[in-house]
Amino acid sequence: MTELTGVSIVTYQHIKVPSQGEKITVNKAVLEVPDRPIIPFIEGDGIGIDIAPVMKNVVDAAVEKSYAGKRKIEWMEIYAGEKATKVYGKDNWLPDETLEAIKEYQVAIKGPLTTPVGGGIRSLNVALRQQLDLYVCLRPVRYFTGVPSPVKTPEKVNMVIFRENSEDIYAGIEWPAGSPEAVKLINFLQNEMGVKKIRFPETAGIGIKPVSKEGTSRLVRRAIQYAIDNDRDSVTLVHKGNIMKFTEGAFKDWGYEVAVKEFGAKPLDGGPWHVFENPKTGQKITIKDVIADAFLQQILLRPAEYSVIATLNLNGDYISDALAAEVGGIGIAPGANLSDTVGLFEATHGTAPKYAGQDKVNPGSLILSAEMMLRYLGWKEAADLVVQGIEGAIESKTVTYDFARLMTGAKEVSTSQFGKAIIKHIL
């Protein structure tokens, strides 16, 4: 261990700890943020090299403007993906000290990561979520005036998705067709469990979908608490319980149980919907549920009826990206992955390697994820300025190519120029 401003820090092999700054800590489930927090960041693969510097510039400008030098983020680079293999060795896509640094410093932000080709880690993003138990994927979706949209009233979309991150078929428990494991499991299901419904057992890949009461409860608890803290009027449990009764159906039932037992929700008109009074504002919060396929229709037809969404992993993936398309695409869709102690904020899009190093793509997703991070730290003033800056740049039609090609009279600018336009509207 070494000492830094009175705070013990793990000694790292390749990570350079800033000479100034302090750790964020958690005390009795409350985040304690110093005025000069050290924030680890993963640049990301592909276009990460373009968007990460812009994100940091925008955040630094917003923090400086808000607090006049009294607060400042000390950025600390950590490694994952292709860059990690160059620093740590060709097969080390997710170094142990990267995970340790995120745990040590509590809050981090990352660009997009390449999924390694071949065996081993199937997805670096999934590996990070599982190894850090980041059980909430938080995806707020809102519309910025002037952003091109394929729907008539995108301004009606204002939802926050709580996607369960640790279970469901994303747990990665599956085996390919014909493998010894698949054959063994199928034989067990047929011979020991009496399963007759596998149509082509000889050529079937097989997977397992775990959904637990504990996993469901902690997600729904966070979603309901978010609705309370942010004065939202409803929490919707989205599921396919009509088909998968003991996994998705159980998710719905356990979700209602949390609302009743922990928040005092009462049946609304005899149920199944429930309602309770927000203890902070006195407003009513409705707990409801919708079948996933019907919900995907409703977000197009009646989006204003939905506010906070709690759902399982696969449904959450579909829903998050479908909603993002309504308000301008994943180029400006932010996201975070949360445990009870760690917050990892991220760009929600891919690495787009063909654009890497061209200073061309929209950095909005990562910048808005940083805005979420600032709000998570309690730095509301800086977060509001980031939103102000993005709104100003878009309203002035100074945008990257993905928006410019769809906007009349727009001025197409580079990634870095878009960052400067945002900062102009911050300052």
Curated annotation (Swiss-Prot):
Its cofactor is Mg(2+); Mn(2+). Changing residue 183 to M: In strain: Priscilla. Binds 1 Mg(2+) or Mn(2+) ion per subunit. Mg(2+) binds at residue 317. NADP(+) binds at residues 114, 349-355, 362, 401, 405. GO terms for molecular function: isocitrate dehydrogenase (NADP+) activity; magnesium ion binding; NAD binding. It catalyses: D-threo-isocitrate + NADP(+) = 2-oxoglutarate + CO2 + NADPH. Optimum pH is 6.5-7.7. NCBIfam families: PRK07006.1 (NF005425), prok_nadp_idh (TIGR00183). Homodimer. This is Isocitrate dehydrogenase [NADP]. It comes from Coxiella burnetii (strain RSA 493 / Nine Mile phase I). The lineage of its organism: Bacteria, Pseudomonadati, Pseudomonadota, Gammaproteobacteria, Legionellales. The gene is icd.
